[in-house]
Amino acid sequence: MSFRGGNRGGRGGFRGGFRGGRTGSARSFQQGPPDTVLEMGAFLHPCEGDIVCRSINTKIPYFNAPIYLENKTQVGKVDEILGPLNEVFFTIKCGDGVQATSFKEGDKFYIAADKLLPIERFLPKPKVVGPPKPKNKKKRSGAPGGRGGASMGRGGSRGGFRGGRGGSSFRGGRGGSSFRGGSRGGSFRGGSRGGSRGGFRGGRR
């Protein structure tokens, strides 16, 4: 009881990974015992009518894969797979007439070779980094650069244009407001009020 319950957490992750292999066993369904069998597990103890085994094979069994004795007599089928990848356990659902308590510790169970999956299938695959693409990078880096240059050119021209306006040379040419710009800048306004402005008004009269 404790073994089965204690490993249910691990079983969840394991089961999710191995369900892909479950469909594979259905594709290769065969009648009768296989021609050859390989060692799959060693008996540990019975649990709720099932057999709990420690895997002695480097590969992982399919769910529902038939399990045999060495003489190819079928004992049952793989029911659950437990534990981490480096220490795999599994349970056997006994067939009709087979008692889990009739086995002793160390008894071996067997499986057909086509009911096994390589353990590498369940290991995380490293990310493959592709070769750099210098052509694409050059195009990408060149486009923003050109844009930046154009933007700077626009910014520069605006700055210069505004500077001219602020300096009153252009504005003055347009509507005489250069004198205002200059007057705001300092001495010219005072002078214009004191002299030029008065003289000009006098001239108009």
Curated annotation (Swiss-Prot):
Residues covered by region (RGG-box 2): 147-205
Q: Where is this region: Disordered?
A: 1-31, 124-205
Q: Where do the record's region annotations for RGG-box 1 lie?
A: 4-21
Gene Ontology molecular function, alphabetical: box H/ACA snoRNA binding
Gene3D superfamilies per record: Probable tRNA pseudouridine synthase domain
Which keywords, in A-to-Z order, does the entry hold? Isopeptide bond, Methylation, Nucleus, Repeat, Ribonucleoprotein, Ribosome biogenesis, RNA-binding, rRNA processing, Ubl conjugation
Protein's name in the database: H/ACA ribonucleoprotein complex subunit GAR1
Which organism encodes this protein?
Answer: Saccharomyces cerevisiae (strain ATCC 204508 / S288c)
Recall the taxonomic lineage recorded for the source organism: Eukaryota, Fungi, Dikarya, Ascomycota, Saccharomycotina
Q: Which gene encodes it?
A: GAR1
